[in-house]
């Protein structure tokens, strides 16, 4: 299936999944396709994302965009004018409390692509994802295999330490993604 047909001006697309599932890799693929179509793309990442100052996945895949502008921000409302931009790509969308700002950009006929976690380490939806969900014309779920048993589909993010902070950026040093069976062993 050619994803580019789903990415139309004025629409919001949402990619959800657990950690380490390939959501950022999917965004990189979308950026490459949009750049091949000579679209001006802006990639927005949260300042809470401590991975790198570039577009980089947990597995180390890095995008070297031709013309894609990278913006780091704590809030989408601080991004400023995007008048000359065709597409807005947002990684770790759950980090942004004002994700609903994407509706304004969609009303301006921009292609909006969001990627975020399906749930927190407490297995609860992020409020900003819940608020933007009804406005998404296309939703994709990317799964992965359980990091504990390597047998079942994993959809749960589990924090390895006792920190209860809702947003705590990190990788495999802080989190594991597991299936329902392994989640029961972790929590109970």
UniProtKB/Swiss-Prot annotation:
Keywords for the protein's UniProt record, in alphabetical order: ATP-binding, DNA synthesis, Kinase, Metal-binding, Nucleotide-binding, Transferase, Virulence, Zinc
Entry-linked SUPFAM superfamilies: P-loop containing nucleoside triphosphate hydrolases (SSF52540)
Cystine pairs: none
Record-listed ATP binding positions: 17-24
Ligand binding (substrate): 121, 166-170
Binding site for Zn(2+): 146, 149, 179, 182
ATP-binding is among the record's keywords: yes
Enzyme class: transferase
GO molecular function, one term: thymidine kinase activity
Catalytic activity line of the entry: thymidine + ATP = dTMP + ADP + H(+)
Enzyme nomenclature, EC number: 2.7.1.21
Source organism superkingdom: Viruses
Catalytic residues identified in the record: 92
GO biological process: DNA biosynthetic process; thymidine metabolic process
Cleavable signal peptide: none
Family: Belongs to the thymidine kinase family.
Protein's job: Phosphorylates thymidine. ASFV replicates in the cytoplasm of infected cells and contains genes encoding a number of enzymes needed for DNA synthesis, including thymidine kinase. Important for growth in swine macrophages in vitro and is a virus virulence factor in swine.
PANTHER family from the UniProt entry: THYMIDINE KINASE, THYMIDINE KINASE, CYTOSOLIC
Protein name per UniProt: Thymidine kinase
């Amino acid at each position: 299936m050619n994803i580019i047909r789903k990415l139309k001006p004025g629409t919001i697309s949402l990619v959800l999944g657990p950690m380490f599932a390939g959501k950022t890799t999917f965004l990189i693929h979308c950026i490459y396709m949009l750049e091949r179509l000579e679209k001006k793309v802006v990639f927005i990442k949260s300042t809470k994302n401590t991975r790198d100052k570039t577009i980089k996945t947990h597995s180390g895949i890095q995008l070297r965009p031709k013309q894609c502008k990278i913006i780091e921000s704590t809030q989408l409302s601080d991004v400023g004018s995007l008048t000359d931009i065709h597409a807005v790509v947002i990684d770790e969308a759950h980090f942004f409390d004002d994700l609903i700002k994407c509706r304004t950009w969609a009303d301006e006929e921009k292609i909006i692509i969001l990627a975020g976690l399906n749930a927190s380490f407490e297995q609860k939806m992020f409020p900003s994802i819940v608020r933007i969900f009804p406005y998404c014309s296309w939703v994709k779920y990317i799964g992965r295999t359980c990091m504990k048993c390597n047998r079942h589909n994993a959809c749960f993010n589990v924090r390895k330490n006792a920190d209860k902070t809702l947003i705590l950026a990190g990788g495999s040093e802080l989190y594991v993604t597991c299936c329902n069976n392994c989640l029961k062993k972790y929590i109970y």
